[in-house]
Amino acid sequence: MLKFKKMGSDKVPLLLVTANVGSIFEEPTTMLPIWTSEFLAAVARMDPKFIALHLQEVGGKTYEKSMQYVRDFVQRLCDCPELRLYDKIRIYLDEDFSSPEKFTALGNMYFAHSTLTDLKIWDFELKSYVDVVGREVNSGNIEKVTTKEKAKFPQQFFPECKWSRKGFLRTRWSIRNTAVEFVNIHLFHDASNLLAMEPFPSVYCRSRRRALRHTLRHLHSDVNAAPYFIFGDFNFRTDTGGVVKKVTEELTACRLQNGTNTESSKLQFRSKSDDRIVLTVAKKEFSHVDHQKIFREPWLQRFDRELEALRPHLYEFPVKFPPTYPFEEDIHLPTHYMKTRCPSWCDRVLLSQSARLLLQHNERPDNRHLHSSRNSDSDASPNRRKLVRNQSEGSPKSGETSAELRRLVDHPTRRRSEYGMIGDTACMGDHK
């Protein structure tokens, strides 16, 4: 979640939310009301004027059985009292599961407040902006809808997976004459903890990086490109091998295997003093004796490395919240992690460097701030931001930054952005 606070008549507070809702639709009668309540409470608390909600795995694993719940979910959001003042709505739901070569199960939902005028959306076929008025819900087969761009990643990007729904769904907006893009993305997961333990970057990390670079090249090659916010389920995982090495420094390892079946092999790490099992790693098991505490400690962020190679192109606000995955899908254990994967920050909100120029900082940005690591002093101190009028995406020549932009960047704002979890103490599914 990311919010830019309003500072003047031409500044707009935005709420950007990403949520993998697959597990919610597995238990819709229990979990959908909780998720919806937490989301609407966040809207009421923050009072944004533009909401961008990006969903992944809409409908869950059995989409054909969940379509009615998806329709009810959309209807509930559109008609709820909390969103009654959001009179301009655009919804894109990729629901055509009968077309596996194109199906992504992505959903982009946008809500604009009645006070937000001069709002337009880009038509990728007309190559121009069109006015946004009223409510428009695009669902089912949305291939011919021209105010969005959707792409499924080539299968060779994820050779370890026989079938995948991963891809991106993109829209471009003009919000009070500021051009900006919102890109929903879903990247491939780690299929096996044992394979993920190979030296960083693992085969899974390399596949995700390949797909993300493919997406960024596509965005930057567009002659009409605008600064973008790309947020979704990146499936970024901590360096599993590095984490295991860290937590097993004083332990003894042994491998258990059932005959020649490597799929059932398991690594156990035991205490030398009392032979107690401290860590167990198998294909779909990652279990530590102190599981609910140890992976919330600050040291884990050192192993959150998947953005390293892309930091010159993408910016992220300081992450000061616990790993977003994998949480128990149990309403009685809303803050507990499942013992299936190493907890990781899968769900992220990232910005292009040109989008960062839309935000006002309390000090002049420089290369040290743009490319510094998450643990640097500059990232640790909360900078303040607001949305300002932008230039187009790309690399502006030196000296071409407008006087207005220089003035806005030089002056501090009065309020801060927020980057964190919605429903941190509620059961929001396996992702938060």
Give names to the regions the model predicted.
Residues 89, 128, 154-156, 162-163, ...:
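Metal-dependent phosphoester-hydrolase catalytic domains
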Residues 117-119, 126-127, 134, 162:
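Eukaryotic regulatory low-complexity N-terminal regions enriched in Ser/Thr, Pro, acidic
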Residues 10-17, 46-51, 105-107, 120, ...:
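Core residues of folded domains in eukaryotic genome-function proteins
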Residues 28-33, 64-68, 122-126, 184-187, ...:
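Short coil/turn segments at secondary-structure boundaries
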Residues 21-24, 57-60, 78, 99-104, ...:
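Conserved beta-strand elements of beta-rich interaction domains across eukaryotes
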